[in-house]
Amino acid sequence: MSNNSRHYSAIDEAILQGQAMLETLFGKPVAQRENPAKGLSQPALTSAEKKQSIGFMRVNHSGEVCAQALYHGQMATAKNPAVRALFTTAAKEETDHLAWCQERLEELGGHTSYLNAFWYTNSFLIGLLAGLSGDPLSLGFVEETEKQVEIHLADHLRKIPSSDLKSRKIVEYMQQDEIQHGLNARSSGAKELPYLVKKLMAFHAKVMTTLAYWI
């Protein structure tokens, strides 16, 4: 039985969330959809271009680690089963992104961020707080998060080497999914967040993207 169709005790929920964290941080994510870059040939990148692609794909991978944590935190505190189901579906699609980014990093010879455990823990707590604020604000948090992520991905598409078609194709697909997640949240009753909260979210994202690019 799926975990969005029954009630779990606090202990059950803690075990499920702990398992999700371990799978995200230490497991090998399995995508339900085919990698959009499959079939594209490996580009001939200079060392500088490869370093640049690795940096951006590492940022994107860490972003997906954060997305998993946020959604799981929100799932744990969602009041409405329909809202919880929406978070569950989005988290599954974000798992595809996680798998695609990790696969591309491995192809490029790069490593994932050494700070992913911190990103996950921090984002999970934020997700819990968002969920505890009520479903409308929690959905508003998703809408604003996805809006900011879409902007980051658009920026990456301007900076990833034009010859790195594999990385670019993955980012393009991710961008479309993020836009749809935001639209789904809005249509499900998202409430707009206060201006200060949006600015704090943008600051948090800036710290993550800056550090994850290098570490």
UniProtKB/Swiss-Prot annotation:
According to UniProt, the name of this protein is 3-demethoxyubiquinol 3-hydroxylase
Per its record, the protein catalyses: a 5-methoxy-2-methyl-3-(all-trans-polyprenyl)benzene-1,4-diol + AH2 + O2 = a 3-demethylubiquinol + A + H2O
Localized where?
Cell membrane
- Origin species: Coxiella burnetii (strain Dugway 5J108-111)
Q: What is its EC number?
A: 1.14.99.60
Record: residues binding Fe cation 1: E64, E94, H97, E178
Provide a GO biological process annotation: ubiquinone biosynthetic process
- Enzyme class, UniProt record, top EC level: oxidoreductase
Topologically, how does it sit relative to the membrane?
Peripheral membrane protein
Q: Which Pfam families match?
A: COQ7 (PF03232)
Q: State the taxonomy lineage.
A: Bacteria, Pseudomonadati, Pseudomonadota, Gammaproteobacteria, Legionellales
Q: What does this protein do?
A: Catalyzes the hydroxylation of 2-nonaprenyl-3-methyl-6-methoxy-1,4-benzoquinol during ubiquinone biosynthesis.
Q: How is the cofactor bound?
A: Binds 2 iron ions per subunit.
GO-annotated cellular components: plasma membrane
The entry assigns this protein to a family as follows:
Belongs to the COQ7 family.
Pathway assigned in UniProt: Cofactor biosynthesis; ubiquinone biosynthesis
Query: Where this protein primarily resides, as one coarse class?
Result: membrane
Keywords from the UniProt entry: Cell membrane, Iron, Membrane, Metal-binding, Monooxygenase, Oxidoreductase, Ubiquinone biosynthesis
What are the names of the required cofactors? Fe cation
PANTHER family, alphabetically? 5-DEMETHOXYUBIQUINONE HYDROXYLASE, MITOCHONDRIAL (PTHR11237:SF4), COENZYME Q10 BIOSYNTHESIS PROTEIN 7 (PTHR11237)
Quote the InterPro entries the UniProt record gives: COQ7_proteobact (IPR047809), Ferritin-like (IPR012347), Ferritin-like_SF (IPR009078), Ubq_synth_Coq7 (IPR011566)
Which GO molecular function annotation, any one, does this entry have? 3-demethoxyubiquinol 3-hydroxylase activity
